[in-house]
């Protein structure tokens, strides 16, 4: 016969805070083990590259208190790995904008030289 399972806590609904998994005890019984909620790393604030920050531990807020500062912050080297995907586009865009400014100046100079003649 199949063993029946009951929750170990008072909350009897399948909510986000009451998630469980099955576990077999040394006495060969199957019981519920309550799982922790999954943590997420902080989002990128740069606005250009979406997604979560790499190099920051993805844990729940209460666990962050116990972590050392190096695990909660991105070092400069890791930040560059995050941004380097965006930088070539920024460099190209800046170069093209400067080229466009030069073209406008040349066209203005040509127009003035045409008027002078």
From Swiss-Prot:
Q: Which Pfam families match?
A: Ribosomal_L34e (PF01199)
Q: Which InterPro entries match?
A: Ribosomal_eL34, Ribosomal_eL34_C_sf, Ribosomal_eL34_CS
Residues where N6-acetyllysine occurs?
36, 43
Q: Where is this chain's protein located in or outside the cell?
A: Cytoplasm, Cytosol; Cytoplasm; Endoplasmic reticulum
Which terms does the UniProt entry file under GO BP? translation
Residues modified as Phosphoserine: 12
Q: Quote the cellular component terms of the Gene Ontology held in the record.
A: cytoplasm; cytosolic large ribosomal subunit; cytosolic ribosome; endoplasmic reticulum; synapse
Q: Which UniProt keywords apply?
A: Acetylation, Cytoplasm, Endoplasmic reticulum, Isopeptide bond, Phosphoprotein, Ribonucleoprotein, Ribosomal protein, Ubl conjugation
GO molecular function ontology, one term from the record: structural constituent of ribosome
Which Gene3D superfamilies does this UniProt record tie to the protein?
Answer: 6.20.340.10, 6.20.370.70
UniProt crosslink position (Glycyl lysine isopeptide (Lys-Gly) (interchain with G-Cter in SUMO2)): 108
**Family designation:** Belongs to the eukaryotic ribosomal protein eL34 family.
Q: Outline the subunit composition.
A: Component of the large ribosomal subunit.
What this chain does, per the entry, is described as: Component of the large ribosomal subunit. The ribosome is a large ribonucleoprotein complex responsible for the synthesis of proteins in the cell.
Its name, as the record gives it, is Large ribosomal subunit protein eL34
Instruction: Look up and give the organism this protein is from.
Output: Rattus norvegicus
Taxonomy of the source species: Eukaryota, Metazoa, Chordata, Craniata, Vertebrata
């Amino acid at each position: 016969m199949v063993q029946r399972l009951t929750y170990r806590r008072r909350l009897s609904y399948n909510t986000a805070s009451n998630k469980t998994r099955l576990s077999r005890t040394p006495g060969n019984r199957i019981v519920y083990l309550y799982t922790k909620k999954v943590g997420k790393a902080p989002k990128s604030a740069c606005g250009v590259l979406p997604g979560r920050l790499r190099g920051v531990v993805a844990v729940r807020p209460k666990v962050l208190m116990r972590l050392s500062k190096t695990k909660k912050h991105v070092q400069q080297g890791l930040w560059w790995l995050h941004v380097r995907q965006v930088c070539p586009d920024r460099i190209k865009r800046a170069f093209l904008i400067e080229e466009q400014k030069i073209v406008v100046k040349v066209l203005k100079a040509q127009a003035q030289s045409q008027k002078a003649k």
